[in-house]
Amino acid sequence: MINGLIGKKIGMTQLFDSKGDVRPVTVLQAGPCVITQRKTANKDGYDAAQVGLVEFVKETRLTKAQLGHLGKNDLPPVRTLHEFAIVADGPSEAESNGEVKVGDKVLVDLFEGSKFVDVTGVSKGRGFAGVVKRHKFAGGARSHGSMFQISGSIGSSAFPSRVFKGMRMAGHMGQDQVTVRNLRILGIDKDENLLVVEGAVPGPKDATVFITMSKKPPRERRGFAGSSTVDPLKASKRAVAKKK
């Protein structure tokens, strides 16, 4: 099976866990998607599947190359395409790769059994921003005649007589590809293809996001929602009692 799919960011809300704590969550429209192309190691050098997000798109909005690519297998017009890796879920890798076929639908039930996902999107654009807003500089003095928002010195004129690469300066802020890792899955709605994850996701509402299974899922932490808490005082007393 493939390790992810394409979705849309619906918006944010909040939920209460079993302990009564508020959890900020993001609702994602995960799919429905369709497999538009199958990449193989023999032909393409690697195993992957090209996936398209099924949504209402006029054929006039697509190029002839896109229409020809989709028309080979009588697929619906899709505008957003993305490649996802194929992970083995069968007794052998060959059998698992053979299960992925062009035209198959990919729905939100792909993430059943998974606890965490990685979400990739494009962050909101903030335009041209100064160093205080862009890099969280403290700024200068707020007294009369001073310039609070100015960045200050960016290099000496004597030596090195240049500006070092990577110098934090004013410039375009946002509109960057951002990946948020290990977002906990709090709910799945199969009927509406909705995925509820804990935390924030880059991008505005209705932004296109790529949802994949977590590459490095974290271990359960003490006191985390859904895990049992341990009283350190009682635990130390039990340890002393065992030694006696």
Curated annotation (Swiss-Prot):
InterPro entries named among the record's database cross-references: Ribosomal_uL3 (IPR000597), Ribosomal_uL3_bac/org-type (IPR019927), Ribosomal_uL3_CS (IPR019926), Transl_B-barrel_sf (IPR009000)
UniProt keyword annotations, A-Z: Ribonucleoprotein, Ribosomal protein, RNA-binding, rRNA-binding
Pfam families xref list: Ribosomal_L3
GO biological process terms, semicolon-separated: translation
An annotated GO cellular component: cytosolic large ribosomal subunit
Extent of Basic residues compositional bias: 235-244
Protein name: Large ribosomal subunit protein uL3
